[in-house]
Structure formats: structure tokens, C-alpha cells
Amino acid sequence: MSSPNKPIPLDIAIIGGGSAGMALATKLDNLSATVFEPKTAAERDCSWALWAQPQQLEEFSPAIRGSWDQWRLIDHSGEIIHQSNQYRYTSLSSGQYLQHCEAGLKDSVSLVRAPIESIVSQGSGGQFSADGQTYSAKTIYDSRPPILDDNSLRQHFVGWEISTKEPIEHADIATLMDFRVDQSRGLHFIYVLPYSDRHLLVESTMISTQLEDKDWYRKAISQWLTERNIQIQSKLREEYGVIPMVPVQPQNADIACIGAAGGAVRLSSGYGLSTIQAQMAVLAESIAAGEYRVPMPFSKRLVFMDKVFNRALDTQSDHGVELFMATAKTLNADQFARFMLGTAGSMEWAKVVLAMPKWPFIKSALKQFLSHD
């Protein structure tokens, strides 16, 4: 190994070995690249989800835990069920996906299991240290979690993976949002993925600016299960997450950011895996052609519309259930999947806008336009 005082030269350094970092790393070839990630894939294992098409199902197959061609949204008035021939709502093990990526790295790409320290930016690259060794990279991509404002709109949740004493009903349908829960603190719903009729993931999810104590989410999960007479045989694991629903600030403004840190999470839905994968595929092709700039994940129009949608959620949360249910009602399954992924066309957007509660949406649009944000 080189002396810590003599920098190891790299063509590309990728800071963070999550979805974006590893997706890019697996697509690099004939370049000396290193991923810097302190935690193992198993240590970071959690549930990821996306609407997957056949090619993606094949790509993600080593990590798929469940896949459904039906999904639903529920409120006190009833339920909306979608069934798709083009998309499957798919749950992945992030740990298994990252392990698969690590196993597929080319010989020219390495993995350093350590955090990076003290970046000194130099153009698109820079110099930094990790595990006592100094590195000098021509290009750096940072995929570390972004910095979040404590008062920003976020999607936050606690989830339990459980086995049940008795078979559950509707094990062939993913429940994306069940709004029949306490709405007093912001938009709140239960999210349920049945991996089988006795094995499921249940999450209590909030969309608000205020994070709750973890016991609050746990109580909501317990109450939801009790009301449906679902008895837990064993609790397999618990996960906790916070997803930004506003533009994010990178940890280092001088370094190119990718993934969530680069704005690749859809602001109004919290879905980002498909966008991240697409962004990294385009970036890898660009790098092979000698272009290192990170492509924009979403159009300016989509970002504006998401900000309008989220402003309505933030300032008039009592309309939140109506906003999501109206969206699901006006779109068919494939249109809804595209809308949540951020790939909906103009006609689909027009249908959503026309279905929205008019005054809250117009008011939010005007405020967003005048804010110049």
C-alpha cells in the first residue's frame, strides 16, 4: 500500500456505496475508480420499492422480496384498486441488491470500507483521506445523504416486518396508502406489503415537517393491526426512514452529487430508485464518452409541479387525503405508476390537475410561482 503521505491517484472517487454509488460503480469500466463506504450492505439492509417493468424485474431479481400487479389506496369512503399489465410494484432488499452490485464490480473498481475525511476540492475532483490513506481523484461523485432542514417537509416512517399467526386477507395486493388512521398531526397513512399471506411489512408513514417519537408510529401500527384482528407471531425487524420532499443541500457544495443528494428522489412521492438507476446509466455512458457532468434527474416543469403539490400538502394538510385519492381515481394503473415515478406525460398531468381540489391547488401554484423558488 502507498504511504499515507503519498496520494493514491484515482480517475473517479465515489463517496457512498448506496443505490446511486453502487449503480454507477457497476457500470464503470477501464477507469480506476474507488467507492468509499464505511458500512457493509448487511448493516444497511432495508426495504426499497419501485414500479418495475420486465427489464427491471430481471435486473433486480437477486434482491426482489415481493412483487404485485395490484395496488390500492384506501380512505373512509372506500378503496381504489389498480391492476397493471406493464408495471409491478416491487419490493427489494437493499442489502441483497448492494451485495449483488459489489460482486459485479470490474477489476478496475475497488471498494474501501471507510468514511472519507477532509475533502480539498480541485476542479471536478480533489484530495481527501480515508482510513489513514490519502487519495487524489480527478473526478468525485458524492452520494452521501443530503443535509435536511429541520423544518422541511419530509416523509418519515417506522416499519415492522412481521409474521402473523393466521393468514391475512388480500395477500395479492400491495396497500400503498391506508388513510384510516390518525390525521391530527399531518398526512398519515399505513403502507402494507404482503410478502405472503403470513409475512408482511407494515409501515406507519407521515408527510409533515415534524418528526414524531418512534413510539408514536409503533402505536399506529399496533392499532391498525388490532383493528384488523391481525396477530403477530414474531417481529422480524424494524426499520426507520426519513425521505426529503424538498430540494436538498449537498454535504459539500463543491462536489458533484448523485442519487438522493443530487435531487433524484421525486419530491411529491418520495420514490427515487428508478430515477437513480436511469440517471446512473446515462452518467456511465457519458463518462465513457468523456463527459463527466451529472445529468438532471427531472425536468424543471416536473420539479415546479411537485413543489406546488407539496406546498398544498404542507399548508393545507387537511386536503392531503383528497389530493392522493383524487390522483389515484383519475388515473389508471399504468398512468398512476408513471405519475409516481415522474415519467407521466402532459395528458396524464392534465388529468391530475383537473382532478385536484381547485382552490387549494390554484392557491399553492400562485404562491409557488411568486416565490421564485
Predicted regions and their residues:
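A conserved beta-strand/loop capping segment in the N-terminal third of enzymes
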Residues: 52-114, 119-121
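Predominantly flavin-linked oxidoreductase catalytic cores and closely associated redox partners
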Residues: 104-232, 250-251
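N-terminal FAD cofactor-binding segment of flavoenzymes
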Residues: 23-27, 33-77, 158
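FAD/FMN-dependent oxidoreductases across multiple families
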Residues: 182, 207-283
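C-terminal helical "tail/cap" subdomain of flavin- and related membrane-associated enzymes
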Residues: 281-373
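N-terminal Rossmann-like FAD-binding beta1-loop-alpha1 element of flavoenzymes
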Residues: 3-35
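Redox-cofactor binding/interface segments in oxidoreductases and associated redox assembly factors
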Residues: 15, 141-143, 257-259
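Conserved Rossmann-like nucleotide-cofactor binding loop
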Residues: 20, 41, 146
